[in-house]
Amino acid sequence: PDKKNKFLKNKSAGITQKGGRIEGLKILNSFLNERSKYYLKNLSKPEYSIDSSSRLSPFLSNGVISVKEIINEYRKRKESNFSSNTKGLIRNISAFNSRLSWRCHFIQKLEDQPDIEFKSMHSAYEGIRDNFTNEFFFESWMEGKTGFPIVDACMRSLIKTGWLPFRMRAMLVSFASYNLLIDWKKSGTYLAKLFTDFEPGIHYSQMQMQSGVTGINAVRIYNPV
């Protein structure tokens, strides 16, 4: 995170974000007006998604701006046709809006099932990794010292900035759960302390999904190499 990158110069979102409503509105406008153009294309690219992701999650989770506000701002622009040559923006923002719907879904899921913070959604997977957790592996993962460059870079960046793109978050969890056999509750508690945009409903559902203990989602193992 300390190394300057030519692709990150003059970016409007920034690696480490400031808080507050004024900053939140600034980030919202820059995303709707410009940065969303490559939202889908760069979703899995850690180098570029720093800027093309919405970067609104910290403001949403801290109540600085609301989902309704984001949707309304998007609708205003869509109705006025933004400007010429904005089809890409509309398509990408529509995809982002669908993720806002999923955000609400997961928050409601935790409210309906508050025990998903502590228990696997499918009881057959409860405690499946309890006897395998290697403390050395766990500490190496927490410190970003596993020896796998992309994993370590993501963890160190998260420690430094409090934020990661979605796919990189998923990879960190997948690596901990499948490669190191760390119980998702242990890794989940640690990650929760690092995210500046920590949202319990999203966090614990994703921890379980990326660890393969829901019983309904496909097993996703990210290649760290």
Language-model-detected regions and their locations in the chain:
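Secondary-structure capping and boundary motifs in well-ordered enzyme cores
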Residues: Y48, S52, P58-N62, S66, ...
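Short acidic (Asp/Glu) and glycine-rich catalytic loops that position anionic groups and cofactors
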Residues: F7, S49-D51, I71, R129-E135, ...
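Contiguous, well-ordered alpha-helical segments that form the cores/surfaces of helical PPI scaffolds
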Residues: S57, F136-S140, P149-I159, R169-N179, ...
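A glycine-rich phosphate-binding loop feature that marks nucleotide/adenosyl-phosphate handling sites
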Residues: S44-D51, H122-I128, V173, Q208-V213
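Glycine/tryptophan-enriched, flexible segments
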Residues: P1-S123
